Amino acid sequence: MPAQTPLASRRQAPPATRRRVSSRSALASFAHTVSPRLRPVLREAEAMGLRGDTRPALDLLIETAAALPSGARDDDRVAIGELAVVVSAWGSELIDAHPFLESLATQVSSPGARGALLFTRGRAGTAAETPEILQRALSEFRLAGDIRGQAVTLGELCWPREDGLSGDYRVTVGREGLALARRTKDPWAIAFCAGRLAGCETYLDRPEALEHWRDAAEVLPSSPDAVTAEIASLNQFNWAHTAYGHGNYALAGRVAREGKLLAHGSTWARKFAAVEALVQWRTGDLDAAAASARAARAGRPQMATGMAGIVLGAVALEREGRPDPKILDDSLGHIEFDEQMLWLALAVRATHRVARQEPFPLRDLPQALSTAAGMEVRFGWEDLVLVMAHEDPEQAREVLESMASLWPVNPRGIAVRLAVEGLVRGVDGHAVLLEAAERFRALPEPLTAGRLLHAAAGVAPDASTGNLLRRQAIELFQTHAADRSLAGVLRDRRLHRGQDLPAVPASQRLVATAGLTTREREVATLAAQGYTAQEIADQLHISIGTARNHVLRVREKFGGVPKRKLAQMLAEGA
């Protein structure tokens, strides 16, 4: 994407001075003349949202709209609707705002106002309904002759979602929207469309995506109003997110720190803290990652809560003997609209399930990969296949073949593909695993590198090479206090014992499994298939009392769920 303005000079400036400061308020709003009596209410609702009181803020806006006289300005309703979506997005009330926004759209008289409210409603919609709502908004903006409105609606249409549109079509629509935005010379419209197009390019793994996120983040001046600041923060956040996904951790960390400094309110500060936590986890600084994740979770549940929960779940798996997987289950509800984070959470949860010796630990992964393939996404799902390759190489081999055309070619994507190829090749994968480990070490992603070195040791051509690789893995895990991974290598029976080997970390001593014992796994597998206690006893040649005791212990380890619910939870493909 060519630069809209001479950006080279700004790129040379110190990070803190990159964004210009605008004296114009409500740069992003379609409401041009808001009534004087409404302005203090909008300021109060915004302040409540910035403090994290998003539900009361939304309630205030709904009550204010209901009290407007029938002849109130269209702009008043537009301003209320725009702010309602922003404060709802800061919390978890977007779905609650849907009926309100639809009602507002029926109360305005001009096509421009209807277009603005439908555009706002479309941005808050689900994947299935959004295209139709945005098409209605586009029609209204065309009736009004509003080029700016048409531009941002096309920009929103190009954003990747599970709606059946092809990736190439999205890029075409996004470029058209950006071209219209440039015609308006409106910085918010340009930033909005540039960011949505960069998001589309990211999911298609286009090499220019990272550069285009930088352009989108830098073009918009900082602004004191919430609606404009939302896109400024969103572009900065997605720039960091994309750099993280590419394995460019130095850039991701820097962009997240800059974003946190300029964040408009606690919600965005927490989201940037969550990105920092992800970077720290990947780069092996588990203590810092846990601290950043806890900071990101301080406040009302929202997307940052889920992102940080992924990190805390991953750190707990390394540091605790029997980590509670509930934090990952809870996190999924807060990140359902971000596929990149949703797939990462599923990958980490599958790793937990493997460590807990659950039946069918990969049960969520095939459906997630099918969704990615249906969306033609080439970014963010590769960790699902890496987890699969460690646990079920044959299944991973099938995925590797079926999704070959969608495999990401960014630096981390290439490293993951090499790792998967090495794991599925078995004894022939030694050299490929070593190459993958070196690529991960260079990112740096030391814990992933250590696991691949341990895997390479298992297929080494001779015992001496295998032990050398195990010791390299031990060094990485010990340096980064990755207790469970370290214990796994130390318990490897093929490891040559020596006086210089460290002891099994205290958190992993006397802990043979993170969850189920071997017998409990056998019982749980049969329970998942609907076997009764008597049938389990007959199948395993144990007494019915012993079978019932095992079922009871398994239920306790899954939070005390009833046996019928346990079977549903563990069912393969559930």
Question: Where are these predicted regions, by residue range?
Answer:
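Actinobacteria-biased recognition of intrinsically disordered, low-complexity terminal regions
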Residues: 1-34, 490, 505-510, 573-574
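Internal alpha-solenoid helical repeat scaffolds
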Residues: 11, 18-279, 289, 308
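Alpha-helix N-cap/N′ positions at the starts of helices
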Residues: 36-40, 132, 172, 235, ...
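Solvent-exposed, amphipathic alpha-helical segments
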Residues: 41-44, 418, 519-522, 526
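Amphipathic alpha-helical regulatory segments at dimerization interfaces
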Residues: 63-67, 103, 334, 367, ...
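Helix-coil-helix junctions within alpha-helical repeat/solenoid scaffolds
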Residues: 71, 212-215, 239-513, 531, ...
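Helix-turn-helix DNA-binding segment
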Residues: 502-552, 556-558, 564-574
